[in-house]
Amino acid sequence: MSIKASDISSIIKQQIKDFNVTSDKKEIGEILTVGDGIAYVSGLENARLGELVVFENENYGLVLNLEEYAVGVAIMDGSNDLIEGQKVRRTGKVISVKVGDQLIGRVLNGLGEPIDGLGQITSTKTRKIFQIAPGVMTRKEVNVPLDTGIITIDSMIPIGRGQRELIIGDRQTGKTAIAMDTIINQKDKDVLCIYVAIGQKNSSIAQIVQKLKDHDAMKYTTVINSSASELAPLQYIAPYTGVTIAEEWMANGKDVLIVYDDLSKHAIAYRTLSLLLRRPPGREAFPGDVFYLHSQLLERAARVTKEFGGGSITALPIVETQSGDISAYIPTNIISITDGQIFTIESLFKSGQRPAIDIGFSVSRVGSAAQIPAIKSFASSLKLELAQYNEVKAFAQFGSDLDETTTNILKHGQKIYEILKQSQYSPISQFYQAIILLAIKEKLISQIPVEKIRKYRSELIKFIKNNSEIIALRPIIEKEKINNDIKEKLIYSIKSFVKKFILENDIIIDNGQNNDVQFINKK
């Protein structure tokens, strides 16, 4: 069989016609400029927003800007090794992270890679870190309580599984302490925890990890650390990495608690990125999409129906204010996104009230739906009593002659604040909280001097622990509505304890109208 020259010629012409000389150029680009953790790359015409690219030094970058002649890439690591003219390769993949139970008890960086020296994570399952939040029909009502172990929160600002509750306040007012106590209180409650540290000091995170280990909390906790020394892109990515890991557990029917500490620094990292990418600045130099930055993150916290796994993600974002100003840009944004806020104030903290929560400004929009019936019943008037106390206290400063009712409100309010004081790492279970709240409601603290209130609380818990009749009622008190018979039994037990406590502590009851008490002066 002979081959004609004309056939060969036509085949070659066809192949030349079909040959695409631009295909390779679109996959491999070149660095135009590099600096401050940002590289501008030409030639990646088909790059997608959020896509990973690989530099010559095998480090990754994240495409954040798509412009006419170049793309803006955030460098994840090794920016000092990059120079103009180096090649950049597309991966065709968006950024994703390993997920699964292997991550429990580990300390990871912002990309989900282990930094605790305990070996690599061998899980093969991954999830994209930028996901759409669950839709309306996917969600379930938030009505299962998430116990914090903090009486002030569980009684007046209850948090439900699937809720987003903001912890907001000035620096050094105990915001992280509230989040840490909540994580520690999840022991034996079948809740997995994720602590995301954004822009914190490495020494602070080391202390937090050690405290979690000391309280056996690392057995159900994952720590993600993107410290202040790391590049802004890693700080920007970290919370999305955390919620992606949480979503895998939620899809498997598990309840997850995630803490973002803190979103103020996250917003600053994003502002840094945006300014370096030459995006137009807006209010306080933040870019126009800073609201979406946090709404897309926090909306991923939910309690979903069984068809979508039946699990939940409860988010506790932390935001730092300046001089108590909650009307600043980032605080108001996040307040409007979340389902309530816990507001910590410096004056309360310095006065010794721990946790330093301002009850007047703090609110939970889920409310009593996320409380056990006993606490819902016994704490129903607590917030009102404290509001009356604060109002009367303000007026009492202007005059010395106070009537009996006003005096009683002041004394009772002072004792309530004292009994609500809680030192860090000492959570109280909801069963004992219910007993304490009943004692407050029935005025069974009125005969106890303020100085003895905290001792009264700890002794009451010990007394109940040794009362087999009340301990037998624990399953009912923790889950069911309390009937009058059970309530009377509890009141009788508390009254018995009060008599015992008064005798043991040499307290004399003043028979006057104010029912005041004083110590016996022993010579």
From Swiss-Prot:
Its main location: membrane. It is a peripheral membrane protein. It is an enzyme of class 7 (translocase). One of its GO terms (molecular function) is ATP binding. The record marks S362 as: Required for activity. It comes from the Bacteria. SUPFAM superfamilies: C-terminal domain of alpha and beta subunits of F1 ATP synthase, N-terminal domain of alpha and beta subunits of F1 ATP synthase, P-loop containing nucleoside triphosphate hydrolases. Keywords: ATP synthesis, ATP-binding, Cell membrane, CF(1), Hydrogen ion transport, Ion transport, Membrane, Nucleotide-binding, Translocase, Transport. One of its GO terms (cellular component) is proton-transporting ATP synthase complex. Its EC number is 7.1.2.2. It catalyses: ATP + H2O + 4 H(+)(in) = ADP + phosphate + 5 H(+)(out). F-type ATPases have 2 components, CF(1) - the catalytic core - and CF(0) - the membrane proton channel. CF(1) has five subunits: alpha(3), beta(3), gamma(1), delta(1), epsilon(1). CF(0) has three main subunits: a(1), b(2) and c(9-12). The alpha and beta chains form an alternating ring which encloses part of the gamma chain. CF(1) is attached to CF(0) by a central stalk formed by the gamma and epsilon chains, while a peripheral stalk is formed by the delta and b chains. Produces ATP from ADP in the presence of a proton gradient across the membrane. The alpha chain is a regulatory subunit. Belongs to the ATPase alpha/beta chains family. This is ATP synthase subunit alpha. It comes from Mycoplasma mobile (strain ATCC 43663 / 163K / NCTC 11711). The gene is atpA.
